[in-house]
From Swiss-Prot:
Taxonomic source organism: Dictyostelium discoideum (Social amoeba)
Protein name: Cln5-like protein 3
GN (gene name): cln5lc
Short name of one Pfam family: CLN5
Coiled-coil stretches: none
Subcellular location: Membrane
One GO molecular-function entry: hydrolase activity, acting on glycosyl bonds
Amino acid sequence: MKNMLNIILTLTIIFIGLIKISISSDSGSSENGIYFYTYDTICEFTNSIRDDDQYELYYVQAPLMYAIYGDLFEKINAYHSGVGFYNLNGGPNISIDYFAGPTLEDALIPQNITKDSQGNYNLTWNTYGLIEVTNYINETYWSKRELIMYGLTGLQVKQYLSWAPIYNQTHPVYNLFSIASADASGSGDNGYLETILHNLGIGGGGGGSGSENLIVYQNSSTCDDFVWASFNTIYQLGGTLVGMQSNPPKDQITLFTTDEPTIVDYNNITQRNQLASFYINLMGIANKNESALQIFQELISLFNGTFYCYIDGVYYELHLSKPTPISFTYQPSPMPTGQRNSNSIETLNNCYSKSSTDNQSFFNRFSKIQIIFISIAIGFGVVIILYISIGIMVNKSRGKSGTNLIPNKKLWTSIGSKFKRDNNKNNYKPLLYNENTIQ
């Protein structure tokens, strides 16, 4: 019941209509050196990454709707999440996340509901899910960070970023809810998270207690789902998981239904008008001159009956479970395990080059210690050249010629004689030990 109250409280604030903003990850612009790349421009960014740079991967989180409410939603474990790559070689760090556009509210209710001349309704939506990459990690915004993997190369990061557009193309709409069956006990709350992740190919096995009775009809498509898909992708590409005492926590909102959701025929005027009535009531809750408590109570009743979900252009009718119609959890979630298969990761063709270091400056190819030794060697060579050049000019002014122009000729000759081979001596032969030579 506590989980249900948490999610209803979250939705109460959403439907009051106070969040007409995007929940994208960072704030910044190209003017201060911060650049934003979406799925269709990521390839412009990948070739700025050096193949041999070393990275660590972090799970980063920010309180939901931080720009308006600060850390308020942190109190109920409601977070926006992403992935952060920290460059260990001094290059730019990288953050990437998946968010609802234009706003989170637009993923829940239609943009417009209009009525035609015959009194029939039409619903239009403006919602999408968008991946955003930034060459910067805003540590004020991403207030929670947890190390997940290490030993990543720049090449693996580029391969991952080339996978991200494929993910966005297959997840074009932000879907807040998973839809699952209620289990045999009617609670619908046991093992569903493990089952969902297992269906996505993440985690070592099936669900926990009760999952054998659970059917997942529809997976969500949220920021956390993108993060866990990212963990799996990086793992398949060769990332090394750190030793964690427990798996990182994941937000999950699930609607539990008593039977399989049915697709609503939008072309059926009767069914379309029922859809419109549902969403009009939903939006009307926020427009009523009522207290937050009254809105809260109306939303509770809303989640105890017939419910409609709009997912990627399709409407679904759900009959929600009475004991537990909805669940909002924030709990440890399985990480990828088992044998890796980098060939299972689909990437965008021609999105990155494996030889980007050819386009880097000379010194960017070496570590700091190597640069120090190279600098010393170059400096020593310059000193020798100057010494010989000045010495030749001085000796020439003294009337010397030929090899006598070389400064300190006797010194250089004696050094050279140390390495001169004596042709009168036998060549070195290794001493072979046998019974006669060993006394």
